[in-house]
Amino acid sequence: MPLYEHVLIARQDLSNAQAEGLIEHFSTVIGDNGGKVLGTEYWGVKTMAYKINKNRKGHYGFLRTDAPSAAVQEMERLARLHDDVMRVLTIKVDGHDEGPSVQMQKRDDRGDREERGDRGDRGDRGPRGDRGPREDRGPRPERR
């Protein structure tokens, strides 16, 4: 069966327990339709880049599944009909990564990020050679 990853965004006014219950509900939908849920994660309340249905924040949930396409379509259909779910994203993947998702890893544990250091190509802002001191330029013009 194909492997999928799903991200659900639920309304911000739900409690954490209700949001986690929503993830469990859709996990059972996948299971009832012949699929297997390989893992679930609750990412918490996050601020979104733009408003969705007048909400600036949302509860994020993540599911890793091994399910037939009919089960995924049924889960997406029910999620879109559910009043508490604002968005659903489903991606077909070649394989699932072991361990927690990138969202759940601590910042220090992310191996692909390098330390920025002092950014040697840019130094501190030194004197501006194209301008002299302010008193040499005369008074600033009046604003109207």
From Swiss-Prot:
SUPFAM superfamilies: Ribosomal protein S6. Keywords: Ribonucleoprotein, Ribosomal protein, RNA-binding, rRNA-binding. InterPro entries: Ribosomal_bS6, Ribosomal_bS6_sf, Ribosomal_S6_plastid/chlpt, Transl_elong_EF1B/ribsomal_bS6. GO terms for molecular function: small ribosomal subunit rRNA binding; structural constituent of ribosome. Residues 93-144 have a biased composition (Basic and acidic residues). GO terms for cellular component: cytosolic small ribosomal subunit. The keyword Ribonucleoprotein applies. It holds the Pfam family Ribosomal_S6. It comes from the Bacteria. Residues 92-144 are annotated as: Disordered. GO terms for biological process: translation. The keyword Hydrolase does not apply. Gene3D superfamilies: 3.30.70.60. PANTHER family: MITOCHONDRIAL 28S RIBOSOMAL PROTEIN S6, SMALL RIBOSOMAL SUBUNIT PROTEIN BS6M. Binds together with bS18 to 16S ribosomal RNA. Belongs to the bacterial ribosomal protein bS6 family. This is Small ribosomal subunit protein bS6. It comes from Rhodobacter capsulatus (strain ATCC BAA-309 / NBRC 16581 / SB1003). The gene is rpsF.
